[in-house]
Amino acid sequence: MSSIYRTVSRKEKPRRHHGLTTQKKQEIKEAFELFDTDGSGTIDAKELNVAMRALGFEMTEEQINKMIADVDKDGSGAIDFDEFVHMMTAKIGERDTKEELTKAFQIIDLDKNGKISPDDIKRMAKDLGENFTDAEIREMVEEADRDRDGEVNMDEFMRMMRRTAYGGN
């Protein structure tokens, strides 16, 4: 199932560099400077939470602490500008991935009912020159269909694609 989705995603849109735009880099720099309120050159957990909100990310205290721990090389409990840029690049990449998966879902959902049905997969596979049996298509749907309604909704699709792409849940 995942090979069909990856093929569709690649056909629809050429691969693009996931670097940050100049505007995004500037926004990150401004956010860092704005929220480094004491001018120390680092951002602590409280400052990071405010910065993340300003950039459009709502996060729990636990998520903020984990973000700091993931990039805090010296164990100071705060992050410097380079660590902040690295962390924000990853967060923005996650958001881009969700947008790409949403587009892929919409392409595969041929009847535009908000769910991917076995018929959608069969027609898409045929358009791509793939030949799957009904049993193979049913197995693909069952792999992702958590609510067991016989179709794959957006949440199920996202979960399955993330599991496929990242080897986890």
From Swiss-Prot:
Keywords: Calcium, Metal-binding, Repeat. GO terms for cellular component: cytoplasm; cytosol; plasma membrane. Residues 1-23 are annotated as: Disordered. One of its GO terms (molecular function) is calcium ion binding. Ca(2+) 4 binds at residues 145, 147, 149, 151, 156. Ca(2+) 1 binds at residues 36, 38, 40, 42, 47. Ca(2+) 3 binds at residues 109, 111, 113, 115, 120. Pfam families: EF-hand_7. Residues 23-58, 59-94, 96-131, 132-167 form the EF-hand domain. It comes from the Eukaryota. Induction: By wounding and infection by the bacterial pathogens X.campestris and P.syringae. GO terms for biological process: abscisic acid-activated signaling pathway involved in stomatal movement. Ca(2+) 2 binds at residues 72, 74, 76, 83. InterPro entries: CALM/Myosin/TropC-like (IPR050230), EF-hand-dom_pair (IPR011992), EF_Hand_1_Ca_BS (IPR018247), EF_hand_dom (IPR002048). PROSITE patterns: EF_HAND_1, EF_HAND_2. Potential calcium sensor. Interacts with TON1A and TON1B. Interacts with SAC3A and SAC3B. Interacts with UCH1 and UCH2. PANTHER family: EF-HAND SUPERFAMILY PROTEIN, MYOSIN LIGHT CHAIN 1, 3. This is Probable calcium-binding protein CML20.
